[in-house]
Amino acid sequence: MEEAATLQSLSISSSSPFPNNSSPVVTAANTISTSESDMFRAPVNRMMRTLDRSFFKKTVPLSAATIFDKQSIGSIKSELLQSQDLLLANRIIPVRAAREGPLENVTDHWYGRKDGKQDGRKCLLLREGIKADDVTTWSPTIQKLVEAKSVEVRPFNLLLDYDYFTYTHFNLREQYLPYKYLLGEILRDKHPQARTVINKTDDVGSHSEFRTFSYEVLAGEDDMLVTVHEQDCEYSFDYSKVYWNTRLATEHERMVSRFKKGEAVCDVMAGVGPFSIPAGKKQVFVWANDLNPYGYECLERGAAKNKVREFVKAHNMNGRDFIRFATERLYQGNPRTVVHRTKVPKAERENSPIRQRKPKAFDTEYLTCPRTFDHFVMNLPATAIEFLDAFRGLYAGMQELFEPYTDRKLPLIHVYCFSTNSEDEALERKDICERISERLGFKITPEDEGRELEIRSVRLVSPTKKMFCASFRLPAEVAFKKA
């Protein structure tokens, strides 16, 4: 995971391999523009089981173009960049302070050395393969600059150490399990904000209806209490007891953007509230539910922490039962009105022609919750489609609440699901529509624009599986169906 300053733990899953023929001990994310150079790869010791940071030291022999007139450094750098002679390596700055000393002893750390004498001149690191003592390795551009006495090519040793080598996101396969504790230490080193590194020992939800997982601690404390920030909201929970996936942050934001102030939303499988709580901040009335008792507790605490309790009401029920329960209670209950006060900006108060405004004026808005839902959100991809039969006859005998009798439309349903990862998107859409139709008892097809149908790919879960979101208007034939 990549929750740099928020989620205080890191996890490793076990579905995808490291790059072929590489050791997990030495995998690095640094890339060289000219090629994937072995010179910049980390040293390899496949026998290492306990992390030895001192082992990861390496001297890379390069060359540097020392510039005689530092006023011309910009133009010379541009020339070398255009001729592809400049070293372009991730995290390494090519502009260095030139140093006095024997030609063979000009050395600097990858991050730039802070000790030693400097003569005020600068040098530019040159790409791998250019040798100071071999003119045949020089490009025409370098030869021209040397002949013009603009630069001097000198040897330059670049020191790499443990701090230089970073890592790419990886999944831990069985053949790398002997390295798991060593990898845990490396991950903690490379993510200073991380308190704990874990390895998932089974698939999410394989042993729990609450989409949790078993894990082992690879480094740090066995403490899974985390704090996450998303969409200006704060969530605190035990990561081992609820489902959370930061990679869905964009999807959370996209869905919440569909909700409008004053609308009513039924979040059937709400979790800790990544849809519900940001919606509450938008002054959307949310009936939020989660089957997990601990998830429900976190949802309630999150609503209080983010000051949206007036708009977000948490429940702990089975999702199918909740669809009917929430619909009935919303219709039969007394209309809920929230008085929302917004502070008038100082500039607006001062510029207002109405001088009767007090120094600290507030605008007051009254928001009344509708008696029917505008949206149903069902975020349980593995099984959410199976709950769609709860919408059969949901508004039976209540036609007068909707168009054409009023300006209210039947609700939009947003159901998340998995499907196979196919090169033919039409097959994916057809499969999802068939599954939805079976549970609704009403045929929906990919071409059914009248239902405001949208089937959108959310993310690739594995090489063979995708996550989708299907949104459609609840058909009147389903909503008003009599038993």
Curated annotation (Swiss-Prot):
It catalyses: guanosine(37) in tRNA + S-adenosyl-L-methionine = N(1)-methylguanosine(37) in tRNA + S-adenosyl-L-homocysteine + H(+). The keyword tRNA processing applies. Pfam families: TRM5-TYW2_MTfase, TYW2_N_2. The keyword tRNA processing applies. One of its GO terms (molecular function) is tRNA (guanine(37)-N1)-methyltransferase activity. It comes from the Eukaryota. GO terms for cellular component: mitochondrial matrix; nucleus. GO terms for biological process: mitochondrial tRNA methylation; tRNA N1-guanine methylation. Belongs to the class I-like SAM-binding methyltransferase superfamily. TRM5/TYW2 family. Specifically methylates the N1 position of guanosine-37 in various cytoplasmic and mitochondrial tRNAs. Methylation is not dependent on the nature of the nucleoside 5' of the target nucleoside. This is the first step in the biosynthesis of wybutosine (yW), a modified base adjacent to the anticodon of tRNAs and required for accurate decoding. This is tRNA (guanine(37)-N(1))-methyltransferase. The lineage of its organism: Eukaryota, Fungi, Dikarya, Ascomycota, Pezizomycotina.
